[in-house]
């Protein structure tokens, strides 16, 4: 499954005194099996971009093509329904949208609307919940008797229960404790590597971006100003400063180390493990 943006612009309240162009002339592509991160300041157009992915918003100008379905501002909703079945959208604080009295009913709500096999959906959701640290009897419990972090994880899996090909998540770990953050991010990564799903992550956490993403899209004032690998992105401190994007902690540690010892390691370390490996290699060659 491939999603392609061709010269996509979106204007809120078009034709009124309050009109605002949130994104303009966006050209990009998302492929199944890859992990994307979208970064940028608040108001840079990230949320508008992802809402155009599954036609929650339709382009004011330009086209969004999902496999063989082309979406314009004129496309009727009946033609978009197959797209929405294959693209799972997890917005910020999704736990606020929980409403069923048991986890099981929450899990089958989406699959039921799309006339999917409910037993398969329940089994798939149960496996994902177990991966997130829930007990075996979680399906019979009420989500409203759980902690905020548990409710967040329940809400995320309720979208994943539809087994979408592309998963879009907007700040999924905001406010979670460290263990829950790791569980959620590792689950998303496993869905990419083990099930060939595309993950599209909006995040302000550059540590997550560095560790998990294959490609990073940088947005500024409604435009894509960069689309590259994390290693290439974090090499250019001047551009990062211009885009108001911070460095991951491990990359900052590497730059501090290189400055202190007046040296240059052979590569950019995106994880603690990679930094240790580069450090040992540097020590060996001293």
Curated annotation (Swiss-Prot):
Keywords: ATP-binding, Cell membrane, Membrane, Nucleotide-binding, Translocase, Transport. One of its GO terms (cellular component) is ATP-binding cassette (ABC) transporter complex. Belongs to the ABC transporter superfamily. Energy-coupling factor EcfA family. SUPFAM superfamilies: P-loop containing nucleoside triphosphate hydrolases. Its main location: membrane. The gene is ecfA2. Residues 3-246 form the ABC transporter domain. It is a peripheral membrane protein. It is found in: Cell membrane. ATP-binding (A) component of a common energy-coupling factor (ECF) ABC-transporter complex. Unlike classic ABC transporters this ECF transporter provides the energy necessary to transport a number of different substrates. This is Energy-coupling factor transporter ATP-binding protein EcfA2. One of its GO terms (molecular function) is ATP binding. Its EC number is 7.-.-.-. It comes from the Bacteria. PROSITE patterns: ABC_TRANSPORTER_1, ABC_TRANSPORTER_2, CBIO.
């Amino acid at each position: 499954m491939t999603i392609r943006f061709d010269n996509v612009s979106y204007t809120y309240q078009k034709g009124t005194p309050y009109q605002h162009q949130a994104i303009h002339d966006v050209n990009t592509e998302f492929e199944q099996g890859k992990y994307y991160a979208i970064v940028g300041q608040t108001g840079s157009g990230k949320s508008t971009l992802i809402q155009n992915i599954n036609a929650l918003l339709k382009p004011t100008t330009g086209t969004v093509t999902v496999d063989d379905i082309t979406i314009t501002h004129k496309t009727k909703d009946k033609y978009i329904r197959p797209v929405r079945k294959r693209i799972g959208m997890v917005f910020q604080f999704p736990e606020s949208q929980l409403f069923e009295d048991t986890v099981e009913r929450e899990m089958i709500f989406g699959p039921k609307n799309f006339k999917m096999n409910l037993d398969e959906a329940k089994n798939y959701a149960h496996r994902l919940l177990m991966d997130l640290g829930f007990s075996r009897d979680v399906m019979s419990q009420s989500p409203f008797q759980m902690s905020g972090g548990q409710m967040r994880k329940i809400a995320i899996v309720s979208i994943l229960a539809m087994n979408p090909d592309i998963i879009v998540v907007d700040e999924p770990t905001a406010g979670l404790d460290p263990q829950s953050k790791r569980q959620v991010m590792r689950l998303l990564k496993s869905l990419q590597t083990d099930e060939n799903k595309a993950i599209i992550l909006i995040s302000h956490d550059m540590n997550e971006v560095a560790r998990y993403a294959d490609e990073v899209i940088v947005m500024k004032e409604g435009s894509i100003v960069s689309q590259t690998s994390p290693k290439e992105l974090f090499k250019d401190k001047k551009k990062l400063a211009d885009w108001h994007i911070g460095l991951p902690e491990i990359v900052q540690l590497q730059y501090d180390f290189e400055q202190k010892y007046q040296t240059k390691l052979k590569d950019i370390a995106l994880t603690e493990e990679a930094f240790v490996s580069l450090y040992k290699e540097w020590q060996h060659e001293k």
